[in-house]
Amino acid sequence: MKKNIKIATLVALLGVFVACSSESTPTYSELGSENYPQKFYVEYIPCNYGADWSPEAFNEDMLPGWQELLVEVDSKVVGAYGLVYENKPEDAQEDGFWQLVWNSKADAEEGWSTWEGYDKATEWNESTATILACGDKEDTFSFDAYVRRDFNSQGEFDAENFASDYQACSYNEGQGSQELISVIDDFEAWLDSENNLISQPYGYMVLAPDYETDEFDFIWGNFNQTAESRVLANENFLENGIIRFLVSSIAE
């Protein structure tokens, strides 16, 4: 039975590992396209520090081998990030997550099948577990991800180190994905208005769980360059009440 993912503030401490419309039938673009909205697949693998953990050990002794294996198996993974808690919840069993980004669920399933059937990948997992031990496919939290705008539209992100926070939401009675798209339409209009005072990189995405859970219907993720800029952005949101007002109309 899959445990619940902890919703909290996460920071991309380890850096980059690898180099919606209101219509009833919206079209989506793949990651890397200049067209939006984009729809893709995101996975969060729970990880725990080993006895030999350090950022240096990860970057020098663990990461290069993983990157080489990705080339060997011709992986379709688009990107990967290491996420750690800014303030770890007391009941969190993991120290952080290894985030994988794919263009589709089919690519993810193919990638996992190839990886788990590759002996050298198994050897790498075992040999690096004292640095960082991560779960397998069964432990992974998978989501359909939706992004309306370029993350660099409010300023260019440094993808090697940023701050993110995730809010779990449940639909109010009679509400669903179409109403959520309408909320996003209104939020987009607000972001482009003079009421938006965000002057630093900011992006957001919406995640729909691709696994059984009664805890929430979707997750709203906000991304800022630093924890300090996140505080300023949140103050802007609170002052205008924009996200809480819009989302609370369909979810809680």
PLM feature segments, named:
Residues 1-9:
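Bacterial N-terminal signal peptides that target proteins for export
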